[in-house]
Amino acid sequence: MPKMKTHRGAAKRFKKTGTGKLKRAHAFTSHILTKKSAKRKRNLRKTGYVSTAQEKAMKKLLPYL
């Protein structure tokens, strides 16, 4: 059986934490920021985590992470 391949796009977007969760950045932070409140932009800077519902799908994309 051939080696499993890592999905390179996903590998660049996610990092694994010490406890095994997947860390991610929030979307909607690159442009059209004038209409977004300071509070919303500040919260978007914080770390997001992959939901437990998506963990199985992410494991397929990132078998060696």
From Swiss-Prot:
GO terms for molecular function: structural constituent of ribosome. GO terms for biological process: translation. Keywords: Ribonucleoprotein, Ribosomal protein. Residues 1-23 are annotated as: Disordered. InterPro entries: Ribosomal_bL35 (IPR001706), Ribosomal_bL35-like (IPR021137), Ribosomal_bL35_CS (IPR018265), Ribosomal_bL35_sf (IPR037229). Pfam families: Ribosomal_L35p (PF01632). It comes from the Bacteria. GO terms for cellular component: cytosolic large ribosomal subunit. Belongs to the bacterial ribosomal protein bL35 family. PANTHER family: 54S RIBOSOMAL PROTEIN BL35M, LARGE RIBOSOMAL SUBUNIT PROTEIN BL35M. This is Large ribosomal subunit protein bL35. It comes from Clostridium perfringens (strain 13 / Type A).
